């Protein structure tokens, strides 16, 4: 191998690990399985290509359950989170690609145990793959452009002995943007996007085309105001059910108008967002963030159209704790590369769960109107770390006229998810941590006919564990978890619950 080849090879880093877990589950409630042990093997391979070179690949490939005895039909639970970027033509043509595979749930109205050894017919293997070629460049000193073609596929597979899975969907989003920045942050932006959604069931596709012009004015270095206007043309296909077509195809076109602002009162505080009027009413996206030396706070409020593959791509596994730690460490570690390494080290040392609680992304045949509010915070101390989040997310299927679909064709999809979660880690010694987590979520129907029985569901997951380093490359943990699910008001047999005791050993190669 040449010296250049050696240099390139050294940029790639692989990290393999393998583990074994033994779990004893005690079940309470009607129609529950017998108590028993479940033994599982797991494996993972981490890939990090570094930031140099034209091809960058980062992420992990593995299985949370590679081989199990007992459990839900000797289940296989893959876990993949990969991102790749190829600079095909220097500083001009790029290709982004992602692959995410994890275990998820069909409906928020069903049981959602976080412990994979607790069986449920609501669980399936969710897969999301995307390929996005794009070009970008500068055509004048202050004018830049981007043309991007996002392609997202969401195949799925059943988990264990359950037959539940979602149809394969496809989303294409062709978007272009040209913008200019002048003065202290003012300027203009031209945008166009054409989104096409194939739900994998109906023969037609949903098409949404939007063109916008945005003008911004910098009042001062801290505040920028903007006005936005445009036009949209949408096409919704006919929806079909058991008895044929239930809702004819529809189309809509109209003017878009609105405004927004970006406000930076201090270097640690930011308020950004916009409001628009569209065919379904108000559309908005507001974000508030603030950081202290050890704390990162964030609040988000959104309302707009969305699709199942869109959400599967943007939030495949929940809100990551790493992004909050990155903000909290910004003051102490200005360099982004060193800060990323510090975040990874902190997560490894504390054993803090990598994600915060978030609403369940579930399959839906139509484009939906999503209205979401969330508040999150992460505190990173010397011996303690704490993360919490609260969320409320309302989902409504809508027609091309902007009104809600009749309940007969909503398939139980219109609902409101409300919940929250807290993660806590305490360092007992240099090699041992106490970790605890609790997540509670309530799902309610938002119409009188979209959900069988018109019931709500309650899901509660919690665990506490002690993690320790047994050897330089070997770690172990013991823990206790509890899960309960019930549907108040339904004609069921009461709540069900599971208490689990487990022990895990993991070795890094």
Question: What residue ranges belong to the model's regions?
Answer:
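Gram-negative and organellar
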Residues: 2-509
